[in-house]
């Protein structure tokens, strides 16, 4: 195996010719499969050793008894040192209280925080509430205003909030993002802090979604539509901004060639090494998804773990796993800080899971991989204008969470009819390891809902074991030629276009091209009929809510616009002038059988346990079930899940996130399921563990809806042992 990046001279020239240095005119030619085949099959980035391994700083696991951030702590470990609830007594866990916000029904993906016996959490009606953590009774409620720019994410604390204790100058505060603002609230009253920004909030230009971190007095957070920011946690003044898509002569700008400079978003989350002042960011796939012809190159800092100086925003290092990602294989979750043993020494590392099924394990200071990181020669594209990266990740250690590719032997055998139904789809599709897209033909891969998701991982600090929930769901995406004509700007918009701008453009974009997380509507007439569109407008689906109330005439006009009927005069589109405008795709679809179950063999959802000292998976068990299939005699299949796990010193792993609306407790050592309880709605965030009034609680956000599906609600549910139950600490 050759050490990357030591290419032989003639092969180095070939690799460079396939990289981001291509002139736009050359980019229209087909990729050279013969030149790609001359490259070595494997390359390897060597493992860190010697001085590149950072000795572990002192850390006291027993100190992890609070929940000051939605990810548990600044290192996103989701570990609790509490042990009143443990393997011996978890079977007696019961509901302690349920809080209903009563202000609507909405999917919430935020884990509450708990400080000093008070819980802070967002509600379905766009408020932040403070609850008595022991009883669930409301202490205060703050109503968050609508964002000034409706295209920005508008749920308060969508994926997290953080408590800052303050300092000699500033009082404690709750910090979170909402829409195009960062808010600072008084934890005691819920009132915005007047000395922070403008009346308790400061502008966040690219929208908010993740839970920030605080280093000394710098609050670091990320924008939904790109970039990472450092704010003064006292005053709200912006201190620095790091461009996740480099600009001008910034490092990495030459890895984007072409007109389609989309985003590379940190929507998975951040972590902080408080002692070293290093912020770690998980960066998602470059945009637009699936179509890379307008963004030739490796597309830094897409699909990277990025380390920044927390005080200045200066880049310290980055590690990119998927290059020129055209499959939406984000590093989707907050990096997790942990300690492992290498070369007989305790080493501080950072771990990050991806939708490609890769578990990155890197030294915190050098950024080098803890294990050799193998790359494999990747296929070339048949899509005119596309330029795939010569190599993609194929690591041996840590073992894959799940393979990124669909294989024919994966096809479901649930019933003969289900098998035949799926095989009919496979026969008309392309598939394979990092197989690029072909025009007009579905591509099957484990991607948009595969591997490790935004719910991320947790770590058992004393053992170094990492727990991650995962999905085995096959994406089915077709790239199509965008051959529509452009509307002549000399004519006024139709009534349907006006309705689209009012009701749809906020998510699908003014040009119907989507925004990377929302599918495009260009070419929708080729995949949906009038009845299907009308039904979708009226009922919504998954993360899409029903369209706002509109009269029949307005609805008909909107459908005409979407189906390209009765439109104003047009003129031919300028073919090939923009890589992004050459192609569109048919949405975020999945391979399913005749009854809507995943089109591959189970398990479809898993809880995985890693020993990261060795990089090996110790155990994995199905997560979730379809009771009707269990009754038919099928072993537990697992379900699609988006929630994440939390581990405790009681030897337990708690997680929800499944389609069956359950929360479960597993034995952290063996994976045995020890307890479960049904929730009023699905629990699509990780549980928090805390102590209030001398009693240990486990709380879960239970609001349903979202990408896993099911009805939406408004609940938080807390569990505890009965008051009379004897303590049995391990």
Which positions does each model-derived feature cover?
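Blade-edge beta-strand/turn elements of extracellular beta-propeller
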Residues: 95-98, 141, 187-205, 234-259, ...
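Blade-level signature of beta-propeller repeat domains, shared across WD40, Kelch, NHL, RCC1
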Residues: 464-469, 473-480, 688-730
């Amino acid at each position: 195996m050759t050490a990357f990046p030591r290419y032989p001279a003639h092969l180095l020239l070939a690799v460079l010719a396939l990289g981001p240095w291509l002139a736009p005119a050359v980019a229209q030619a087909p990729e050279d499969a013969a030149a790609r085949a001359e490259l070595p099959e494997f390359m390897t980035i060597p493992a860190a050793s010697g001085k590149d391994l950072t000795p572990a700083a002192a850390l006291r696991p027993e100190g992890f008894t609070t929940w000051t951030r939605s990810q548990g702590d600044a290192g996103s470990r989701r570990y609790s040192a509490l042990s009143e609830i443990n393997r011996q007594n978890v079977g007696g866990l019961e509901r302690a209280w349920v809080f209903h916000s009563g202000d609507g029904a909405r999917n919430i993906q935020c884990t509450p925080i708990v400080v000093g016996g008070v819980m802070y959490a967002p509600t379905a009606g766009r408020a932040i509430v403070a609850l008595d953590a022991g009883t669930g009774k409301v202490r205060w409620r703050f109503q968050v205003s609508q964002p000034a720019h409706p295209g920005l994410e508008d749920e308060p604390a969508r994926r997290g909030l953080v408590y800052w204790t303050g300092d000699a100058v500033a009082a404690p505060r709750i910090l979170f993002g909402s829409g195009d603002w960062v808010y600072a609230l008084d934890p005691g009253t819920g009132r915005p802090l007047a000395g922070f920004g403008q009346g308790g909030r400061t502008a966040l230009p690219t929208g908010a979604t993740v839970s920030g971190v605080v280093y000394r007095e710098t609050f670091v957070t990320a924008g939904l539509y790109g970039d990472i920011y450092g704010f003064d946690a006292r005053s709200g003044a912006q201190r620095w901004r790091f461009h996740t898509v480099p600009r001008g002569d910034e490092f990495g700008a030459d890895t984007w060639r072409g007109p389609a400079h989309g985003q590379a978003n940190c929507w998975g989350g951040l972590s902080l090494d408080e002692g070293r002042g290093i912020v770690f960011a998980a960066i998602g796939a470059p945009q637009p998804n699936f179509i890379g012809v307008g963004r030739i190159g490796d597309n830094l800092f897409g699909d990277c773990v990025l380390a920044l100086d927390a005080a200045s925003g200066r880049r310290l290092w980055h590690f990119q796993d998927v290059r020129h990602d055209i499959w939406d294989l984000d590093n989707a979750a907050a990096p997790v800080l942990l300690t492992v043993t290498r070369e007989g020494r305790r080493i501080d590392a950072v771990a990050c899971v991806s939708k490609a099924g890769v578990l990155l394990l890197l030294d915190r200071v050098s950024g080098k991989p803890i294990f050799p990181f193998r790359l494999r020669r990747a296929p070339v594209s048949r899509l005119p204008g596309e330029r795939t990266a010569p190599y993609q990740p194929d690591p041996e250690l840590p073992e894959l969470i799940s393979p990124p590719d669909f294989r024919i032997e994966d096809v479901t055998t649930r019933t003969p009819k289900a098998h035949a139904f799926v095989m009919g789809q496979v026969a008309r599709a392309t598939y394979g390891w990092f197989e690029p897209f072909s025009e007009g033909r579905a591509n099957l891969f484990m991607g948009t809902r595969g591997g490790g998701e935004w719910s991320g991982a947790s770590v058992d600090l004393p053992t170094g074991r990492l727990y991650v929930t995962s999905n085995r769901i096959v994406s089915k995406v077709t790239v199509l030629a965008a051959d529509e004509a452009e509307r002549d700007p000399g004519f006024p918009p139709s009534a349907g276009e006006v309705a689209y701008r009012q009701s749809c453009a906020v998510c699908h974009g003014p040009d119907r091209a989507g925004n990377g997380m929302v599918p495009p509507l260009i070419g929708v007439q080729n995949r949906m009929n009038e009845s299907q569109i009308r039904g979708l407008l009226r009922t919504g689906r998954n993360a899409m809510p029903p369209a706002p109330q509109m009269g029949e005439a307005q609805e008909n006009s909107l459908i005409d616009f979407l189906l390209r009927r009765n439109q104003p005069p047009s003129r031919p589109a300028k073919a090939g002038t923009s890589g992004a405008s050459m192609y569109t795709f048919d949405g975020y679809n999945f391979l399913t059988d005749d009854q809507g179950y995943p089109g591959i063999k189970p398990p479809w959802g898993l809880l995985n346990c890693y020993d990261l000292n060795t990089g090996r998976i110790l155990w994995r068990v199905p997560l979730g079930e379809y009771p009707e299939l269990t009754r038919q005699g099928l072993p537990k299949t697992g379900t699609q899940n988006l929630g994440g796990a939390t581990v405790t010193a009681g030897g337990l792993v708690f997680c929800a996130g499944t389609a069956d609306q359950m929360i479960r407790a597993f034995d952290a050592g063996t994976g045995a399921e020890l307890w479960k309880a049904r929730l009023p709605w699905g629990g699509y965030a990780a549980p928090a563990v805390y102590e209030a009034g001398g009693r240990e609680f486990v709380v879960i956000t239970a609001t349903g809806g979202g990408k896993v599906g099911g009805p939406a609600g408004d609940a938080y549910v807390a569990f505890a042992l009965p008051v009379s139950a004897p303590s049995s600490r391990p």
